[in-house]
Amino acid sequence: MAETQVRNFNINFGPQHPAAHGVLRLVLELDGEVVERVDPHIGLLHRGTEKLMEAKTYLQAVPYLDRLDYVAPMNQEHAYALAVERLLDIEVPKRGQLIRVLYSEIGRILNHLLNVTTQAMDVGALTPPLWGFEEREKLMVFYERACGARMHAAYFRPGGVHQDLPDQLIEDIGKWIDPFFTTLKNLDDLITPNRIFKQRNVDIGVVKLEDAWAWGFSGVMVRGSGAAWDLRKSQPYECYSEMEFDIPVGKNGDCYDRYLIRMEEMRQSVRIMRQCVDLLLGKERVGPVSNTDHKIVPPKRGEMKRSMEALIHHFKLYTEGYHVPAGEVYAAVEAPKGEFGVYLVSDGSNKPYRCKLRAPGFAHLQAMDFLCRGHMLADVSAILGSLDIVFGEVDR
């Protein structure tokens, strides 16, 4: 009997697939049920953010950053604000730094809650997302009370933050902390020892440390493979050097380790938040929240109604904006998904000459082929869930 050559089977995973996390299209080449090749097709959410920023003043460009990783918006603004501040060579007052750190950690918890629970949902557990969204809702309200918006905040501005936080809000954040530990324990008890969850994640998507560096991984993807690399510790910015927290590090570099790290990072974020709350209600209770140079930071409303100079400053800042000295700078923050960097080039005008955004998800997604090869088709969604991809930042 003549031998027939069996061809590999090509299928599309996404862009409408519920486990594709947005608009990802993967072309999978399958040998039976074993994945031979993965070809990610991106760009379905490309909006030309970097080009649009070149036509806006430095302040007008801030809201574009919210729309990248829209799960934790303020962390992106943070990198941009740091870049502009370095070019302008200005300092952020202590209270402003504490508010930034507090809200960056809220963003980290928002992100990890979504990721951990949807990673469980990708492998068939439907309860965790409902619990996770309940907590995220409370955090969204803290966002809203700080700046009026639940998602697209535009709260971190070059020079500091837009408005001061009322004491009541800081106290409420402090009251939220202890009950959250109970929620985390419930999630932990439900997912971590679960036999099915373990079978779907242990020894799946293993990354050795040298491979993680070679593919340009950062954040949880590197820490899961055994490197204690966290920009908050290794290259501290704002007041992270004064905060006490630990960096969780994995051993095996698989999906399960990455899940465990995200769970522990939420506990560490809460530790940082508690320290910030204590300081903001203690010795940093009063003080400016942004730089007081009115050539860069707009004056207060009340001042504007009394002083002609303040009114002129306000008008100039919101029409022409401030001119940033020519130069280039790279600022990176430890965003929830990894190292989010902003490479900013200024030509001395009031608009960025070029703003390159370094999205962590982009580097992680390009390794999809390397991660999935040899795994089963069902493991693709487990691996994708552990990468923590949001398409706003991948496609930009």
From Swiss-Prot:
Class of the enzyme per the UniProt entry, highest EC level: translocase
InterPro entries: NADH_Q_OxRdtase_suD, NADH_UbQ_OxRdtase_49kDa_CS, NDH1_su_D/H, NiFe-Hase_large
Compartments where found: Cell inner membrane
GO cellular component: plasma membrane
Source organism, top-level taxon: Bacteria
SUPFAM superfamilies according to UniProt: HydB/Nqo4-like
Gene3D superfamilies registered for this protein in UniProt: Cytochrome-c3 Hydrogenase, chain B
Keywords noted in UniProt: Cell inner membrane, Cell membrane, Membrane, NAD, Quinone, Translocase, Transport, Ubiquinone
Cross-referenced NCBIfam families: NuoD (TIGR01962), PRK06075.1 (NF004739)
Main function: NDH-1 shuttles electrons from NADH, via FMN and iron-sulfur (Fe-S) centers, to quinones in the respiratory chain. The immediate electron acceptor for the enzyme in this species is believed to be ubiquinone. Couples the redox reaction to proton translocation (for every two electrons transferred, four hydrogen ions are translocated across the cytoplasmic membrane), and thus conserves the redox energy in a proton gradient.
Assembly and oligomerization: NDH-1 is composed of 14 different subunits. Subunits NuoB, C, D, E, F, and G constitute the peripheral sector of the complex.
Official protein name in the record: NADH-quinone oxidoreductase subunit D
Organism: Brucella melitensis biotype 1 (strain ATCC 23456 / CCUG 17765 / NCTC 10094 / 16M)
